[in-house]
């Protein structure tokens, strides 16, 4: 465990002691080394967990998310270079420090063994994210977005703290591995209903559940590129990870409580997909598509079958890489045209032909083209929901069609057609951007060859 935490901490002095022309090289190279070392975590035998210490452990559910977290830091650094080129030296270093501290908190969140430690770190990830959004966002609305983000997440997770104290008093431990062997079932009573809601609400706001999702498009649209990437790729997965961990404790209460939330998610999935078709803002479209994909994950986790769990974990990893790549592409447009409105950035295929290839690949993985892991995740979720209730196949089918529609709409609006004259003199695509896109798409394509490593503990 320390071989990931200590190098991550040492990134901070490296950043602050680097000369001006070496900051990006040093931090990106060092973080890439950390992300390559993290691949060693894949070498786990069977379904046992690696108990690093009494506080940290890692199993086949948290390992893919850990690796995704560490893989994302060099990509965020590569994506932010242009955005920060006009800032002064101290601010650059401060920004990189924020990203590093965020990665540190996330590594510890995904490996925490005690629920209360998980809660503390879960809340700690708020601080760097909030600073990144409110300090380095593009428009003045970023303060409003930061406020939404902070209060939704805080108000959602305060009841969780109360529920955790209650569990601590009844069971005597908050250790994940101990709680699995706590045999006393949680029966239907008013207090247990509230306990279930308190435990789940924090993660449902984070996911986000349809109806509690209003902070997400705001935060995504106003955040700088690194903020959007880490928000879509990892912070939403904290919600899914927490739900997967905490449903083990709340049995059989979840079967009793899940019905309205599954209905709300299925409805929200269709609604947010439909909202995507009416978006003019590119980042907002990708943000709403995230809500619709995460609704699938909520449904899968609440159904609680081995298949749906595997689908949920696969979909979380697939969505993390795909949405992060889409945000990078949207940002490469924004850096050239200084607008997120899709109608102003049309016909880019003629000017940036290589970027059009990345756009095509990203859109196709987003609409779950076979044989990508997005499709594997979605198929598992669709099959498990179908066995839960046959009528859901209608909603799932409609959702898949709408997903394909808005992905192609996004691709055609930005790449096809006649380009407008104000983008005649834009700069070509840089090697940095092509490297960034290939580092997003490469894991997706490689996971297609061996998807079982991200199917979670039940495979």
Curated annotation (Swiss-Prot):
It catalyses: a ubiquinone + NADH + 5 H(+)(in) = a ubiquinol + NAD(+) + 4 H(+)(out). It is an enzyme of class 7 (translocase). GO terms for molecular function: NADH dehydrogenase (ubiquinone) activity; ubiquinone binding. Pfam families: Oxidored_q5_N (PF01059), Proton_antipo_M (PF00361). One of its GO terms (biological process) is electron transport coupled proton transport. The keyword Oxidoreductase does not apply. It comes from the Eukaryota. The chain crosses the membrane at residues 22-42, 60-80, 94-112, 116-138, 147-167, 196-216, 224-244, 256-276, 284-303, 308-330, 351-371, 393-413, 435-455. It is a multi-pass membrane protein. Keywords: Electron transport, Formylation, Membrane, Mitochondrion, Mitochondrion inner membrane, NAD, Respiratory chain, Translocase, Transmembrane, Transmembrane helix, Transport, Ubiquinone. The modification N-formylmethionine is found at residue 1. GO terms for cellular component: mitochondrial inner membrane; respiratory chain complex I. Its EC number is 7.1.1.2. Core subunit of the mitochondrial membrane respiratory chain NADH dehydrogenase (Complex I) which catalyzes electron transfer from NADH through the respiratory chain, using ubiquinone as an electron acceptor. Essential for the catalytic activity and assembly of complex I. Core subunit of respiratory chain NADH dehydrogenase (Complex I) which is composed of 45 different subunits. This is NADH-ubiquinone oxidoreductase chain 4. It comes from Bos taurus.
